Amino acid sequence: MPKGTIVKALSGFYYVQNEDGLFQCRGRGNFRNRNIKPLVGDEVVFEAENKTDGYVLEIMERKNELLRPPIANVDRAILVFSAAEPTFSPLLLDRFLVHVEANGIEPLIVISKIDLLTEEELETIKQYRNDYEQLGYKVYLTSTIEQLGLDAIRKEFDDHVSVIAGQSGVGKSSLLNAINPALDIETNQISSHLGRGKHTTRHVELIPFGSGLVADTPGFSSLDFIDMEPEELSHYFPEMRDRLPSCKFRGCTHTQEPKCAVKEALAQGEIREFRYEHYVTFLEEVKTQHKRRF
């Protein structure tokens, strides 16, 4: 049986790509019975007598899976956040970072629209860039209007399956179009009434991009910490993860406990205060979600 990758899911059809071309397939009924849904990015076994009448028979084991956007087997998450319109939100960025770290995906941070900033505002954004780079993240400052930073990002897509995600209205589609004008992905102007972008991308699709594949996904602005245990959260903050073995108490939440290596590092300025505050905010959310489950 042939194998391939689902590159698009739309209206009950799954479009499977392999070396022989693109095949339009439906899922077998037993997927529904087993509560399994094929996802874009899935490696699958399928059968097809022609290019428009195939069936997905088996889904290979996934290395990871995102719920929003619904996609599997992602290598990298390109997280696009605007410096302005909408205003840069490190709180939302950290929420995304936790989400992708928890799924074993390598994040890259892109801060767009830097052409809209004053010199003082740009210095603030550069400080954030330094903060995140010190944690080991790659950070790019870009402007599609002034064509800044695009060449460096273009290389990051090669030989990877990447998802491009971020807050609605930050210019994800514009960024992809600027890097590869042949894509011509639909874009909308930001809604002046709401101060938020319209959701121009209505389905998930993997698009050939250099020697890799990229998914331009529906914009979204919130992520829930579903199924996460409270003691897990600190593992997704790199500056905390390395210090966990030095905490006195196993299962330390790094809030009230004595002899906490994380709080000691915070007091010494080795952990940025805004990152710790975000951790505490997320921890309360995780605890609330946990109580709802049990």
UniProtKB/Swiss-Prot annotation:
<comment type="subunit">
    <text>Monomer. Associates with 30S ribosomal subunit, binds 16S rRNA.</text>
</comment>
<protein>
    <recommendedName>
        <fullName>Small ribosomal subunit biogenesis GTPase RsgA</fullName>
        <ecNumber>3.6.1.-</ecNumber>
    </recommendedName>
</protein>
<comment type="function">
    <text>One of several proteins that assist in the late maturation steps of the functional core of the 30S ribosomal subunit. Helps release RbfA from mature subunits. May play a role in the assembly of ribosomal proteins into the subunit. Circularly permuted GTPase that catalyzes slow GTP hydrolysis, GTPase activity is stimulated by the 30S ribosomal subunit.</text>
</comment>
<keyword id="KW-0694">RNA-binding</keyword>
<dbReference type="GO" id="GO:0005737">
    <property type="term" value="C:cytoplasm"/>
</dbReference>
<keyword id="KW-0862">Zinc</keyword>
<dbReference type="InterPro" id="IPR010914">
    <property type="entry name" value="RsgA_GTPase_dom"/>
</dbReference>
<keyword id="KW-0479">Metal-binding</keyword>
<dbReference type="GO" id="GO:0042274">
    <property type="term" value="P:ribosomal small subunit biogenesis"/>
</dbReference>
<dbReference type="InterPro" id="IPR012340">
    <property type="entry name" value="NA-bd_OB-fold"/>
</dbReference>
<keyword id="KW-0690">Ribosome biogenesis</keyword>
<feature type="binding site">
    <location>
        <position position="260"/>
    </location>
    <ligand>
        <name>Zn(2+)</name>
    </ligand>
</feature>
<dbReference type="GO" id="GO:0003924">
    <property type="term" value="F:GTPase activity"/>
</dbReference>
<feature type="domain" description="CP-type G">
    <location>
        <begin position="63"/>
        <end position="223"/>
    </location>
</feature>
<keyword id="KW-0547">Nucleotide-binding</keyword>
<feature type="binding site">
    <location>
        <begin position="166"/>
        <end position="174"/>
    </location>
    <ligand>
        <name>GTP</name>
    </ligand>
</feature>
<dbReference type="GO" id="GO:0019843">
    <property type="term" value="F:rRNA binding"/>
</dbReference>
<keyword id="KW-0342">GTP-binding</keyword>
<dbReference type="InterPro" id="IPR030378">
    <property type="entry name" value="G_CP_dom"/>
</dbReference>
<dbReference type="GO" id="GO:0005525">
    <property type="term" value="F:GTP binding"/>
</dbReference>
<dbReference type="Pfam" id="PF03193">
    <property type="entry name" value="RsgA_GTPase"/>
</dbReference>
<dbReference type="Pfam" id="PF16745">
    <property type="entry name" value="RsgA_N"/>
</dbReference>
<feature type="binding site">
    <location>
        <position position="247"/>
    </location>
    <ligand>
        <name>Zn(2+)</name>
    </ligand>
</feature>
<keyword id="KW-0699">rRNA-binding</keyword>
<dbReference type="GO" id="GO:0046872">
    <property type="term" value="F:metal ion binding"/>
</dbReference>
<keyword id="KW-0378">Hydrolase</keyword>
<feature type="binding site">
    <location>
        <position position="252"/>
    </location>
    <ligand>
        <name>Zn(2+)</name>
    </ligand>
</feature>
<dbReference type="InterPro" id="IPR004881">
    <property type="entry name" value="Ribosome_biogen_GTPase_RsgA"/>
</dbReference>
<comment type="similarity">
    <text>Belongs to the TRAFAC class YlqF/YawG GTPase family. RsgA subfamily.</text>
</comment>
<keyword id="KW-0963">Cytoplasm</keyword>
<dbReference type="InterPro" id="IPR027417">
    <property type="entry name" value="P-loop_NTPase"/>
</dbReference>
<feature type="binding site">
    <location>
        <position position="254"/>
    </location>
    <ligand>
        <name>Zn(2+)</name>
    </ligand>
</feature>
<dbReference type="InterPro" id="IPR031944">
    <property type="entry name" value="RsgA_N"/>
</dbReference>
<feature type="binding site">
    <location>
        <begin position="112"/>
        <end position="115"/>
    </location>
    <ligand>
        <name>GTP</name>
    </ligand>
</feature>
